[in-house]
Amino acid sequence: MAKIAKRVQKSREGVDPTKLYGLTEAVTLVKERATAKFDETIEVAMNLGVDPRHADQMVRGVVNLPNGTGRSVRVAVFARGAKADEAKAAGADVVGAEELVEIVQGGKIDFDRCIATPDMMPLVGRLGKVLGPRGMMPNPKVGTVTMDVTGAVKASKGGAVEFRVEKAGIVHAGIGKASFDAKALEENIRAFADAVIKAKPTGAKGNYVKRVAVSSTMGPGLKVDPATISAA
């Protein structure tokens, strides 16, 4: 514990918690302070001016990060027949129909992302209480209920990240690893931020992006000037 506390304290040296950093400087500082013995995940959090308790202020979507996430993603596909074969050929890790529903209902979830063909949704709908709280329920709005099984599987494994605003108006995601070069991390952050901005709901009033922060798994969070994150 003492070693961990010492590392955390050292990682905070040279960081001003009150300063609003430009994205480039923030990414550089976060990378420099990601000194754990594992490849830390770099995360971005955006505080939005929305109240997700209202349906017209919900923010959700999916973005394909240009440089991937750096993590291996296990994908499950609910499909039958030719579409099940297509899913396997595309690289899905788990494929099935009724039997897969039973396995998931039994509490075994050996995957990170879930895709379903439209005809499977009456069955998959039974898994709402299991998959919903984990943010894994297939949804056509984010491309996980689709007949394009190949495209969905490849997107999921290639860097697709789903996002959904939480109760406090915060949306966050892991957008890469500390081992990524700074430019790749910046590109991923900009892609994520642009997707969140484009997903601005009709009910959002006033300042939409209030605060942005970037951090690593074990490092301090740095405040980022929202004006520096747009890819435009």
UniProtKB/Swiss-Prot annotation:
CDD domains xref list: Ribosomal_L1
Entry's Gene Ontology molecular function annotations: rRNA binding; structural constituent of ribosome; tRNA binding
CC annotations in GO: cytosolic large ribosomal subunit
Top-level taxonomic group: Bacteria
Record-level GO BP terms: regulation of translation; translation
Gene3D superfamilies per the UniProt record, alphabetical: 3.30.190.20, 3.40.50.790
Keywords: Repressor, Ribonucleoprotein, Ribosomal protein, RNA-binding, rRNA-binding, Translation regulation, tRNA-binding
Sequence similarity: Belongs to the universal ribosomal protein uL1 family.
Function (record text): Binds directly to 23S rRNA. The L1 stalk is quite mobile in the ribosome, and is involved in E site tRNA release.
Subunit record text: Part of the 50S ribosomal subunit.
Name used for this protein in its record: Large ribosomal subunit protein uL1
Lineage of producing organism: Bacteria, Pseudomonadati, Pseudomonadota, Alphaproteobacteria, Hyphomicrobiales
